[in-house]
């Protein structure tokens, strides 16, 4: 009987917290696969010439393609949106569950088949060695003749459907299921970030679906959408892909903004500085994200006027981003800061995300980008905002909320060891890439001239440090989950909530908090609210 109940609970779950837990477990599993791929990349690049991959350039490209897809679609998005989003959005707005609980279930269960298809694509024929952009003509039937690219396309379709359904669910939930008195301008910033992200997904994913479906018919049904021989244009694919691809990078980072806002507010023991400005900054970033896509295509032969516009528009995004950075700093300023692991990750996020943003402003210049496009400078830039922005935000959220999710508090010592090893590791890995890029080392090539050896060796050494940090994290997770259940306080950070601009009442208790999750037990009951909470 136990077995059947367990199977029913986890396979057919309609409970947002259980589904959020499934997403988190899935993303940790996928993240380990993606990390393994990244280590293969760095080991191959540890020296010039052939190291590990038999001089097989196709295999190298299959690995970087899989690394990108897994890290984006199966680590960051499931963890932030699926994991923390499903777990905390209903709790934070005082809703009993998501609006469509069964839709929520299939949103999760579309992801494992998608991951299997993606990993499977690497094992048939020569693999999909296209890079995550899947540009034709390289991805066309002439240059990738097997079924690999088709499997990767189906994988993307499934992951896309999953995200779309999840987004519909989030938008409906946040707009319609808030507790009495919980107006939009009283929502926690994390809920706002999930709402904005869901809208971006809903608007951008259909364009990607159309682009890769046309690629599928080009490959299998002899259409010529991207083939000049039949009146098509491969640049059309680039426009369609990046119209999705650029909002996608904001889809990755905006939930991170939301997490960082919650964490910085708690550990500064102050309300966030400029709440409304933070909301409108996130919304502005979301809108601007849709009108800058061609900055990925400066080298493709666009009109000079077009390039001038995209340069200007891209730089405008730095303004709302700067508003967020300085509002976080203003929150910290004069705060009675509590130095715990989540706070370290949040401070690391601020510093490293800012570096990534500055290199982004450089790359926004069309004239300079002609020199830096497709070099390691670009790799350094987006790994600073992803590997040290999104992932640091993820870990901040993990250490911040793990006690709330499991009822067991993490080990502070190993948490801080994890932070410092990871902080050192990722910087040693990615900072030298700026120098390689400025010297013209191209991306996506497994071999390089001897002159580039020094920085590559340092970079590969950094990836070993990062691996150690990942092992420390997994050990800390093991320590957390294997300890006996402690009676963890509802508000276990003990941050006084009198400063909060949004006091929440639940029942006749006098507990109030900056957001509603801290008035519930740790872990919350299977059905969190027996009666409606009220927002004062």
Swiss-Prot record:
Heme a3 binds at residue 381. InterPro entries: Cyt_c_oxase-like_su1_dom (IPR023616), Cyt_c_oxase-like_su1_sf (IPR036927), Cyt_C_Oxase_1 (IPR000883), Cyt_c_Oxase_su1_BS (IPR023615), Cyt_c_oxase_su1_dom (IPR033944), Cyt_c_oxidase_su1_bac (IPR014241). Pfam families: COX1 (PF00115). It is an enzyme of class 7 (translocase). It is a multi-pass membrane protein. The keyword Chloroplast does not apply. SUPFAM superfamilies: Cytochrome c oxidase subunit I-like. The chain crosses the membrane at residues 21-41, 62-82, 105-125, 151-171, 189-209, 240-260, 272-292, 310-330, 343-363, 382-402, 417-437, 461-481. There is a cross-link at residues 246-250 (1'-histidyl-3'-tyrosine (His-Tyr)). It is found in: Mitochondrion inner membrane. Its cofactor is heme; Cu cation. Ca(2+) binds at residues 44, 49, 446. Component of the cytochrome c oxidase, the last enzyme in the mitochondrial electron transport chain which drives oxidative phosphorylation. The respiratory chain contains 3 multisubunit complexes succinate dehydrogenase (complex II, CII), ubiquinol-cytochrome c oxidoreductase (cytochrome b-c1 complex, complex III, CIII) and cytochrome c oxidase (complex IV, CIV), that cooperate to transfer electrons derived from NADH and succinate to molecular oxygen, creating an electrochemical gradient over the inner membrane that drives transmembrane transport and the ATP synthase. This is Cytochrome c oxidase subunit 1. It comes from Allomyces macrogynus. The gene is COX1.
């Amino acid at each position: 009987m136990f077995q059947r109940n367990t199977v029913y609970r986890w396979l057919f779950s309609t409970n947002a917290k259980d589904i959020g837990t499934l997403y988190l477990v899935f993303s940790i599993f996928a993240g380990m696969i993606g990390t393994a791929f990244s280590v293969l990349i760095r080991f191959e690049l540890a020296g010039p010439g052939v190291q590990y991959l038999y001089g097989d350039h196709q295999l190298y490209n299959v690995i970087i393609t899989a690394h990108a897809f897994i890290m984006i679609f199966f680590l960051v998005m499931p963890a932030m949106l699926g994991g923390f989003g499903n777990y905390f959005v209903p709790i934070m707005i005082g809703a009993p569950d998501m609006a469509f609980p069964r839709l929520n279930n299939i949103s999760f269960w579309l992801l494992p088949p998608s991951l299997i298809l993606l990993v499977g694509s690497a094992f048939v024929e020569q693999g999909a060695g296209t890079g995550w952009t899947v540009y034709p003509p390289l991805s066309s039937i002439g240059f990738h003749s097997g079924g690999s690219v088709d499997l990767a396309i189906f994988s993307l379709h499934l992951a896309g459907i999953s995200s779309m359904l999840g987004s519909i669910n989030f938008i409906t939930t946040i707009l319609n299921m808030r507790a009495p008195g919980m107006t939009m301008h009283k929502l926690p910033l994390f809920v706002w970030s999930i709402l904005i992200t869901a809208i971006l997904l809903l608007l951008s994913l259909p364009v990607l679906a159309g682009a890769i479906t046309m690629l599928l018919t080009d490959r299998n049904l002899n259409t010529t959408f991207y083939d000049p021989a039949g009146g098509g244009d491969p640049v059309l694919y680039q426009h369609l892909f990046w119209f999705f691809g650029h909002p996608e990078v904001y889809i990755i980072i905006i939930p991170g903004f939301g997490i960082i806002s919650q964490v910085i507010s708690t550990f500064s023991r102050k309300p966030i500085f400029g709440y409304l400005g933070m909301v409108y900054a996130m919304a502005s970033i979301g809108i601007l994200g849709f009108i800058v896509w061609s900055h990925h295509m400066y080298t493709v032969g666009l009109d000079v006027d077009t390039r001038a516009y995209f340069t200007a528009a891209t730089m405008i995004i730095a303004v709302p981003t700067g508003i967020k950075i300085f509002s976080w700093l203003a929150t910290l300023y004069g705060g009675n800061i509590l130095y715990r692991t989540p706070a370290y990750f949040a401070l690391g996020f601020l510093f490293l995300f800012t570096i990534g943003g500055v290199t982004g402003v450089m790359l926004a210049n069309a004239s300079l980008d002609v020199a830096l496009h497709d070099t390691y400078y670009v790799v350094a830039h987006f790994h600073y905002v992803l590997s040290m922005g999104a992932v640091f935000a993820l870990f901040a959220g993990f250490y911040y909320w793990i006690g709330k999710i499991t009822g067991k508090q993490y080990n502070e010592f190993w948490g801080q060891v994890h932070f410092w090893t990871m902080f050192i590791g990722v910087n040693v890995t990615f900072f030298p890439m700026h120098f390689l890029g400025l010297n013209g080392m191209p991306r996506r090539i497994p071999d390089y001239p001897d002159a580039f050896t020094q920085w590559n060796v340092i970079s590969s050494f950094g990836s070993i440090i990062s691996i150690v940090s990942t092992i420390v994290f997994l050990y800390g997770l093991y320590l957390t989950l294997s300890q006996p259940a402690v009676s963890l306080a509802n508000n276990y950070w003990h941050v006084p909530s009198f400063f909060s601009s949004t006091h929440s009442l639940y029942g006749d208790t006098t507990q109030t908090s900056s957001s509603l999750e801290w008035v519930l037990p740790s872990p919350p009951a299977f059905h969190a609210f027996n009666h409606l909470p009220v927002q004062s």
